[in-house]
Regions:
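Long, contiguous binding/interaction regions
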Residues: 1-110
């Protein structure tokens, strides 16, 4: 099985319109094989802002990252691999595009 990546695109309530426009752009431009989640207008799990998620095979990472860099504007993005150690996935194995946000790491175990 190939490595799967999760990408979380965060937004503040006042950025919801921009986030929805970005979501629509990504829906039209993401490569085949990507899963694009709906906008979640509240904090969920370890995430400290509203967000939406994109899941994809590691082979698509360059294409997805390029699209996000081109279109994300001021929105922070967390990219991380799916792995058994959720804490490591969201910290040492993760990287940020834009501002690095705090996460509720205690919800991830270790």
């Amino acid at each position: 099985m190939s490595l799967i990546y999760h990408t979380h695109v965060y937004f503040l309530p006042q950025q919801a319109g921009f986030a929805a426009a970005l979501h629509a752009t990504l829906a039209a431009q993401l490569p085949a094989g990507c899963w694009l989640g709906q906008l979640i207008h509240r904090e969920v799990g370890p995430h400290t802002r509203p967000m939406f998620e994109i899941d994809f095979a590691a082979s698509l990472l360059p294409a997805v990252e390029t699209l996000l860099q081109q279109h994300r504007g001021p929105l922070p993005v967390l990219l991380h691999p799916q792995q058994a150690d959720e804490l490591a996935a969201h910290t040492s194995a993760a990287r940020w595009l834009g501002e690095a946000l705090p996460l509720k790491l205690d919800t991830l175990g270790g």
